[in-house]
Structures are given as C-alpha cells and as structure tokens.
Amino acid sequence: MALLQISEPGKSLAPHQRRIAVGIDLGTTNSLVAIVQDALPKVLPDEQGRELLPSVVRYLPNGRTQAGFEALESVVIDPKNTILSVKRFMGRGISDVENIESAPYDFVDQPGMLKLRTVAGDKSPIEVSAEILARLRQLAEDSVNDDIVGAVITVPAYFDDAQRQATKDAAKLAGIEVLRLLNEPTAAAIAYGLDNATEGVYAVYDLGGGTFDISILRMSKGVFEVLSTGGDSALGGDDFDHRLYCWVIEQAKLPPLSIHDHRTLLQACKHAKELLSHNPLARVHETLADGTVVNVGISQAQLFEITQNLVSKTLVACKKALRDAGLKAEDIKGVVMVGGSTRMPNVQRAVGELFGTKPLNNLNPDQVVALGAAMQADLLAGNQSKDDEWLLLDVIPLSLGIETMGGLVEKIIPRNTPIPVARAQDFTTFKDGQTALAIQVVQGERELAQDCRSLGRFELRGIPPMAAGAARIRVTFQVDADGLLSVSATEIGSGVKASIDIKPSYGLTDGEITRMLQEGFSSAKEDLLARSLREEQVSAQRLLDAVQTALSTDRALLNEQEQAAIDQEMAQLQKILNEETDSSVVRKAVDHAAKATDEFAQKRMNASIQKALSGKNVAEI
C-alpha cells in the first residue's frame, strides 16, 4: 500500500521551498536579526526602519515587560528595573563581575548564576536575554510573514561552557530552536566573503559593547580553521564609557552620585565618546537632580590617553593569539574589524600598527556579525547549494580531562583542538573488588587536579567485582559544534554506563582562563615533578595494598623469618610513602620492596597451580 504525504493546509509542497532561518547577534549594547533574501544577507529593520535593537529590558509592577527602544527610554528614570548589558552576567556569579559596585542593580547572590532583583521578582540573566531574543524572533516572523525554523546565534569566541549553555537556555525560553552557536569572529569572516575564494591567514578583531575577541583564522578552499582565540568577555565599549565617566567625575569634582544621576551622566559620557569618533572635540553637558550643571570638555587626544590601557589590553590578547597560532604579525593577510567600539580612531590606529596593515572596515561593524550568522543559518537550513558550503573548524580554549588516582590529571582533549570532537581513553580500577568509580571532569593546563577547575563529577556504579586493574572503563569526551561538553564512562565487559552533560553552575572568567594558561606554562617543570611524585606514590600504595591482600590469605606459605622480613619491608615502604618528597627515592623503595616479595609471589603461584591440579589425572589436564 502506498503511503500518502499529507501537508499542512496552505503550505507549499514544493521540495525546493526555502526554509526561513535567521542569524542573531545577541550583543551587549545592541542586538540584531538578519536573514538571507535573494542570495544576499540583510539585517531586518523594525516598523520604524531601525536595524539595531537596544539590549535593554525593563520590568514593570503590573507584570508587563518592555524591551529595546521602549525600555531604553527608562534607563534614567527607573534604573533598578531597567537592565542593560546583561550579556556581561551570562553564566556568571557575583564574584566574577567586574565593576559590580558601580552597577545600579540589586544583585541576588545565589549558587550558580547571579540574579537581579526587580519589581517583577528576581530575574536571571537567562530570563532577561530571553526577552531580547523573543523580540528579535517576533520581528523576524513579522518581516517574513512566516515561522522561522531556527537561528544561528553568535557568541564571543572566549565564552566558556557555562556562558554558551546560558545562551542556548535563553533561546529555548524565547521559543527559538538553536541551529548552532557561532563564534562572532567566524561569523564576521563569513560576512566579509572570506570563504571559498579566499586563501591565507586573517585576524578578526571584535570589540563590542561588553566583550572583546581576537581570533586567528586560516582560510583554505572553503575551510575556516580557527588557529587560536583570545580575548576578554568583560572588556568592551562599556568600559570606555566607565573610564570617561570616572574622568568627568574627577574633573568636575563631583561627590558620590545617586543611581539616577549616575545613569544620566554615564549616558552623556557615552554620547560624548561616540562624538569623538568623528570629531576632535566633544562636551559632556548634563544637569543633575539637585540642579548641579556638569559641563566638561574633552578632546580626542584626552580620550585616547585615559583609555589607552584598555586598548593595550586588547593588543596583549592579540599578541598572545599570534603566539598560540605560531605566527608573526607579518603573516596576517588582513584584519577584519567587528563591533561598534572599533569605530574609535585610536583603536583602528593601534590595530593597524600592530599588524602592519590597514584594517578591513568597509562593512558596518555593528551588522557584520549578524550578516555572517544569517549566511550560516541559511546554509544549515538547507537553502544553499553544495558549491556555497564551507566548513567551520573552531577550537576549545583549555584542555579537558579527568582526575586519576593520586589527584593526577589525564588530559583527554588538549587545548586548541578543533571542534566538534570526540576522544576516548581506557582506565581501570585501583582496588580489588572495586564496584564503583568516581569521575571528576576538569579543565586546565596543570598536572594536578587541585590546580585545575572542576567542571563536574559523576559515578559509574555496578562494575563487576574483579581484581585491581582487570576492569576496563572507557571514558569518552564529546564536544559539540557549540563548544558544549558531555562525558560518558562504560565498563567494557558488563556494558554498565554512566554519563554527564557538563553544565557548571557558572563559568570561567577570562582572567581565570588567562591565569590558568599562564600558570600552566610557568609551572610546567614544577607540575611534572609533582606528577612524577604522585605516580610513584600511587605505585607504592598499589604494592602495599596487593601485599596486604596476599598476606591476609596466604601468610601460612611463609615461615616466621620470611613474614618478619616482608612486614619490615612494607613498614619501610609505608614510612617512605608518608614522608618522602623525592620521586626517585620512592621509586627505588618500590623496586626494592617488590624484589623482597618476589619469592612470596612465586610460592603463591605454585600453591595456586597445585590447588588447580589437585585430584586430576593426566588425561583431564
């Protein structure tokens, strides 16, 4: 019997019908949504023709929520309930947020991600971001008069697992199917057409409202290979605004300001900063609530001076990304500029001097990421031909592994490994009859688990009892195209399995990532010595446990003198294990103790063979 295909009324049966997928740039200051129409990407404007949606959400006492321009109007009059720059808080705890004391919000410190207290209740950054995403989804569906099948949402390349997962959760809350999380620098490269026809190595310098990213990419016949990434997810245009704000406070000799005056003056400083991108002079002119008039002039040169250390921080990250990629500045064919903050002349000049080439900025830096995301979304929706396809090879920023016996780290996936990736490694039990295994997943470059960051723990139970070292436990790490990690463990013989999707309560700050990398490099020799000692200590403990087990069952095979000799040898080994810090001394003690028990091991083997053959004739053997 033939099967009939039944379509939804009003829907086309044409197999070539385009599926509408969008690209979303969920930014710190502004957010955008874009689609591909007539083979070209375009940012979708609202009814007033505005292409940028301010990333601002306001909560009202009556339960209503405002987002975008409507909410932006309330920044000064209702600062506690009007949330700006929420991207800075995604996947973060209170201790992770820089300059938190200057923020006008009431923060709620909870295990995991922080929350913000509003008249509508405590709100997580995920909930706030979901409001912005929901408005973008509605804008897209109204523009195309159809439902969207999904979205490619961009994130900073240096976003960690917690920040990426928080972004996906926000999209889910907004009713958006995430086709992929795409790193912002890669999206920008796609938008610039650095795809099929382009060869060479490019840098993407992305300085947005709240985040900074630098990525080094190699283009080769449609393959985007990310060689290295760097940046700071807590550095952006907001920090330039704050630096200018502090300077104005100092120049005008103002006392500590109220939340209302703080927001008012900060907005005036932001406006002056933007004017200075195209004018040599600007003025911060604002009247405070008590009638005080602030009137401070500032030149381009003065702004450059007070923000120079912020620009320098981005250049340090650029140099590190080059080192990680094994390249020099002269190896870079071009530099793509992304983000509204790259309009600042001192930023463009500094980047040009570092790389020795004029940066590419012919596309609108506010739109370029969304345009690239739209092109990737169109590809994933199946709307482009094979000739238009490209392959994206992003990387993970820090090594991933597990803690083994003795607190050592066994790295499963090294840093800068292209994703998606799956790696497996076999491990075994440490003690006889061991029926469970605790697995701690860690992230970092150090040799000891205590020096790395724990991402999660889980247990594999139900391992059949057997001798130490006999069980085979296969641990598999999988990192998907979004950079999210899952880990599974399987006992090969029985098929017993356990797994975990890594969703840390909150993620690493970029300072932590940098610190972990630096500590990994600077402590390499010290770490290797510590690892060597731990390995020998594990060997010693394994021998002590094995001999103790053997004596408990077969002590009768030894005479009193032999028993005393082994007991003395084991006591000496235990003493060295407890007190010695030189791995070579521990190794010699283990070797000596092992030789001292060789005769006992031979007697046990002979007794075991004799027992197995007892009562059998030659024909049965």
Swiss-Prot record:
What's an example GO BP annotation here? iron-sulfur cluster assembly
Identify the domain of life: Bacteria
InterPro entries to which the protein is assigned, alphabetical = ATPase_NBD, Heat_shock_70_CS, HSP70_C_sf, HSP70_peptide-bd_sf, Hsp_70_fam, ISC_FeS_clus_asmbl_HscA
Q: Which GO terms describe its molecular function?
A: ATP binding; ATP hydrolysis activity; ATP-dependent protein folding chaperone; unfolded protein binding
Which keywords are on file for this protein? ATP-binding, Chaperone, Nucleotide-binding
The answer, when asked if ATP-binding is one of the entry's keywords, is: yes
Function, as annotated: Chaperone involved in the maturation of iron-sulfur cluster-containing proteins. Has a low intrinsic ATPase activity which is markedly stimulated by HscB.
Which family is it part of? Belongs to the heat shock protein 70 family.
Which PANTHER family does this UniProt record tie to the protein?
HEAT SHOCK PROTEIN 70KDA (PTHR19375)
Provide the protein name: Chaperone protein HscA homolog
Identify the gene encoding this protein: hscA
